Amino acid sequence: MSDAANVIELELYIIRHGQTYGNLGKAMDSFSELDRNDVLLTDKGQHQAEKLGERFSNYPFDAVYSSGLRRAMQTATEIIKRQPENGAENIIVHPLLSEVGGVEEEYSGLTFSQAEKMFPCISLAEGFDRNGRIISFTKGWSDKEQLARAEKVLSHIRSRYKDGARVAVVAHAAFNTFLFHSALGLDPEKVIFDPHFLNTGVTKIVFFREGTGRYNIDVQLVYQNDLSHLYADYPDYGVEPCYF
């Protein structure tokens, strides 16, 4: 927390998962139904997630949220594994963090119990049924509906974490775009801007207590799509146009 003239309520870190087999654009006909609809990280994606975890190994989070899709939970796990003693100890799975149209309706998604067997460090966000599925189907939703979903997630977090709390949200490129717009008060139907979230890119947004932000603005974009944790191993990543 800073001085009384500039009081931080929440530091929000919006993060995209590591590279997946789906990101490579290759045919996945030989994959199982689960692996086609709920893709896993590639070896490179796993390494990206590990480097992400190292980035925050001395940076305690009050909470780490993840979507209920495996690629996000895999990535969030690498953050949790490397948190300092005073950092977050589990991953909070929030079903509304699912990717925009990220799964087919024929795929019902994992139950919490199934996911817990794969990722023992998860818990379920307050207000959701442990016996239910942990993803949301949003294929065909309008931008306005997707933005409303992002606003629900943001409201959930901001109502629970205050007084300088640090929260990481590990989700997906398209959904993170709506979360980004929601956090900054932007209308995606009017603003032509693609944040272009890359794998394990980190975006930091700070919310100030009302009336205490610089220039009387209570939200600040500190940095967007930061990949500095990958530069040592992937010096050209993010320099040339790329989509994963």
Where are these regions (language model features)?
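An N-terminal RHG(E/S)-centered segment typical of histidine phosphatases
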Residues: 1-62, 77-81, 85, 211-244
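Acidic, low-complexity terminal tails and accessory targeting/binding regions
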Residues: 1-11, 99-121, 163-165, 181-244
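Phosphate-coordination/substrate-recognition cap region in phosphate-metabolizing enzymes
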Residues: 7, 50-127, 195
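Beta-strand elements within well-structured catalytic alpha/beta cores of enzymes
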Residues: 11-15, 65, 165-171, 175
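Active-site catalytic microenvironments for nucleophilic, acid-base chemistry
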Residues: 55, 78-82, 156, 182-186, ...
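Glycine-rich phosphate-binding loop signature in dinucleotide/nucleotide-binding domains
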Residues: 58-60, 157-165
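Short glycine/proline- and acidic residue-enriched helix-loop micro-motifs
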Residues: 119-145
